[in-house]
Amino acid sequence: QMGLQLQNTAYSVNIKERLDFSCALFDADGHLIANAPHMPVHLGSMGESIKTVIRENAGVMQPGDVFVLNDPYHGGTHLPDITVITPVYLGDAEVPMFYVGSRGHHADIGGNTPGSMPPFSTRIEEEGVQINNVKLVERGVLREAEMIALLQSGEYPSRNPAQNLADLKAQIAANEKGVQELRKMVDQFGLDVVQAYMRHVQDNAEESVRRVITRLKDGAFTLALDNGAQIQVAIRVDAASRSATIDFTGTSPQQTNNFNAPTAVCMAAVLYVFRTLV
């Protein structure tokens, strides 16, 4: 339902027609509970963005607050993918019990080429406006002027801040749909039951992956890229603990272009591989 809300209310073609967006629910610690079948690279990395908001707003977060970020160093992917995060408060609780998040590919966030993905960029500033843990809504009030000012800042500001703001409002609405449905579920079944079932979902997912791991074998692989770099990965399986270590030692260092994968994207790729095996 969050995804349909976002698709129906978004402004940009990327979200409305190309469906380059994702929505998900997270527990109080920022761990994934459930997601729609959207973009794997979003869903495997969004939790790191949630954890950034939790960590950097501990003790100051309030009901009605909504946060926004696209920072690749804090769970983001590339700068056009903007994440909106809404804490979910229940009753008189002083801390959020859940979080809902939506990530959408905006048509432009600045940078030295339209679309904000210049292949010849050598600095992240050349790709557009970088946003980390910015309060988009404060106690229910949209900080529109502050957001427009941020989108118009930096060396290469957004080319269409009004369109960005329209898509951000759609993401806020999608999140609010998730908040409403969570509250309805808690009202119907009780918080203890809802949290118990959420833990069961997480435990079941973990057990499913551990079963897959026991069928895997150690291996090492190298892929040469056409720019002279290489990706090297090794998997080491510990059958006793039913766990695996994925080691990228030997992979080429960061390149002086925009074809680099931040940590969250690497994690998302690994998680997606395990998902396909379950």
What name fits each language-model region?
Residues P40-V53, A107-S116:
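A short, polar/charged loop-to-alpha-helix boundary motif
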Residues T83-G91, G101, V237:
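A short, hydrophobic, proline-anchored segment that marks a local hinge/packing element in signaling
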Residues V95-P157, Q254-Q255, A264, A268:
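Gly/Pro-rich active-site capping loops and adjacent beta-alpha segments
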Residues H31-N35, G47-D71:
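Regulatory sensory and allosteric helical modules in signal-transduction proteins
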Residues S252-V278:
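Alpha-helical support elements that line or immediately flank enzyme active sites
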Residues Q1-R18, I54-A58, V68-T77:
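Short, basic/aromatic recognition patches
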Residues Q130-E206:
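N-terminal leader/propeptide and maturation segments of large enzyme subunits in energy/redox metabolism
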